[in-house]
């Protein structure tokens, strides 16, 4: 049975004081109401250690928004998975649309990260999704297929148990727009089918992978989204950055 996951992406928001306050609030509130859902938060890199210490021993998982695909080395400005392990972080987000759009991260670059992380016993949250222009030109499925096939190329089947996917329609992020549950379900179903075609035997593996929806998820739409067969949770931006709205997602 697939896990239902509510993952909060704090992006480059919140001061240290705000992040610490939110982490304490989450520790106090979320474990008691999460029930059968898995809760995750992805603070900014500078706040990871503080938030990890606060949530240590709770059911809330702390993840990193990014890292580099290397051990300790001369890559100025980057963060190594080795450094993340030192502070107890074992989940990393890869391929978020903002990193693709503004920092030029390609499917192949994402693939380098994913393969390195999985081989080093991390769980990866891999983000895929189309822009407004790609959607309007009818290229949604083509774009997603490339992101899945190129981003997950060469990954051994044994590692797929540590893989989570998130579909984030770029046109819906931070705009207040949201795909209808049926529109989101159609794309999630396609993603699952694409995974099932990656290699022989992938069909059963694809059924076990959680696929989150990540387009302006809020308390007033999360329940309708979760009713769909292939939507297994949410990758949440703004609504995860206040304890009141984050708690309502559970």
Curated annotation (Swiss-Prot):
- Write down the PROSITE patterns for this protein, in alphabetical order: TIM_1 (PS00171), TIM_2 (PS51440)
Q: What domain of life does the native source organism fall in?
A: Bacteria
Q: Does the UniProt entry include the keyword DNA repair?
A: no
A single Gene Ontology MF term assigned here is: triose-phosphate isomerase activity
- Check the record and name the Gene3D superfamilies matching this protein: Aldolase class I
User: An example Gene Ontology cellular component term from the record?
Assistant: cytosol
EC class of the enzyme, as a word: isomerase
Please name the Pfam families in this protein's record.
TIM
Tell me which UniProt keywords the record has, alphabetically: Cytoplasm, Gluconeogenesis, Glycolysis, Isomerase
Where on this chain does substrate bind?
Answer: 9-11, 174, 216, 237-238
Functional note: Involved in the gluconeogenesis. Catalyzes stereospecifically the conversion of dihydroxyacetone phosphate (DHAP) to D-glyceraldehyde-3-phosphate (G3P).
What family does the Swiss-Prot or TrEMBL record give for this protein? Answer: Belongs to the triosephosphate isomerase family.
Query: How does this chain assemble?
Result: Homodimer.
Name it: Triosephosphate isomerase
């Amino acid at each position: 049975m697939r896990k239902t996951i509510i993952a909060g992406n704090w992006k480059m928001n919140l001061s240290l004081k705000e992040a610490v306050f939110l982490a304490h609030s989450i520790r106090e509130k979320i474990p008691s109401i999460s029930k059968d859902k898995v809760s995750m938060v992805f603070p900014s890199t500078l706040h990871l250690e503080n938030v990890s210490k606060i949530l240590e021993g709770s059911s809330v998982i702390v993840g990193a928004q990014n890292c580099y695909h290397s051990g300790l080395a001369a890559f100025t400005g980057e963060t190594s998975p080795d450094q993340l392990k030192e502070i107890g972080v074992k989940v990393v987000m890869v391929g978020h649309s903002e990193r693709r759009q503004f920092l030029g991260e390609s499917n192949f670059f994402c693939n380098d990260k994913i393969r390195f992380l999985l081989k080093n016993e991390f769980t990866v949250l891999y983000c895929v999704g189309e822009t407004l222009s790609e959607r309007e030109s009818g290229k949604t499925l083509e774009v997603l297929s490339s992101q899945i096939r190129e981003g997950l190329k060469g990954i051994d089947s044994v590692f797929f148990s540590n893989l989570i996917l998130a579909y984030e329609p770029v046109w819906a992020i931070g705009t207040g727009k949201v795909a209808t549950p049926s529109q989101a379900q159609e794309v999630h179903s396609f993603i699952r089918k694409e995974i099932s075609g990656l290699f022989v035997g992938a069909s059963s593996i694809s059924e076990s992978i959680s696929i989150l929806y990540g387009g302006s998820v809020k308390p007033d739409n999360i329940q309708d989204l979760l009713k769909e067969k292939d939507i297994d949770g949410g990758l949440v931006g703004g609504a995860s950055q206040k304890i009141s709205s984050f708690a309502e997602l559970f």
